[in-house]
């Protein structure tokens, strides 16, 4: 039996054993509030509240005075929550009286399990094992072009599976092709990110559009659709809004895998509370997922010139740094690539992206993968996409309707084509 087959069967066995029946988390009569701090004292109150109870869920990090924060509150916690806000004179706005009802309004269309190897498409979302089976089928049907790769492991023993694509070989005129690394799904609830990653894989292998063919043939691609498999499985079996890994920390679970990378870890924009959605972990690379994936990427040092991380939502394009407002030394080039990329994303459907450096464009966030890649791996171009929908979508932002998978992915690929063209023109692929 081939290594690829052995790996796949082991993966599916692990997934099957881990997917035991669990009571699905529901949010009936949970309320969602938008709050906004007006001063540092109010911000500290919110920081203390974040991670204080699993009955109060912050959908946004508590980082900046004046920034809107979405908070989901269990029915029995509402009186205490409002009392705390009232005592500190923190302004709030009720956005949903029944979070579950709001979530149910979006039909995400999840594919029937076990059908993916013959009917994988982008009209629906897929569970982890079906996507892994599809990746395996690509390696089998595209020998010499697609290689199954294991980017790392998870706490629950799953593999972080992806593909290496070398269309036309790994060299051009005797020289190694530049490398593009793409990871998605590091935050479990952001389903559109893995879906877009698989769409890109398919387009690289099948598209007859000239600029996409050039993108496939001129670069070596490393694509990992699920950088947080345990968390993604948990969003399907138990809690659709789960974000973190599934490592146990006392009575709470998981660390934020995009605050856990070993570059200015936990300096700003992360929490030290294990119950928080932005928990940085007890130490840098405490999570098996980030540690093992970082080791894989370190093995590619010198081979990757462009690093991409797919997230959702808000329609942002972001570049380093997240730990400081100081700008990269090649910020002028980042701005040129940024301008070309957001112009391209707008052309097909008129979708508007904004962004810039992470710290100033959205919020401080140390320990992110793009910062680590740029800061430690000599990857001079590193970007994070926050995909559809827009930042005003609030609660339903993580539940992009399945009919938007294709347009969201098409405009993303348009942007990546323009990005690669600009990065090449600036000499980073030389």
UniProtKB/Swiss-Prot annotation:
Secretion signal span: 1-22
Q: Supply the EC number(s).
A: 3.4.17.-
An example Pfam family from this entry, by short name, is: Peptidase_M14
- Which GO MF term does the entry hold, naming one? zinc ion binding
Query: What superkingdom does the record give?
Result: Eukaryota
**Any binding details for the cofactor?**
Binds 1 zinc ion per subunit.
| InterPro entries per UniProt | M14A-like_propep, M14A_act_pep, Peptidase_M14
Q: What is this protein called?
A: Zinc carboxypeptidase A 1
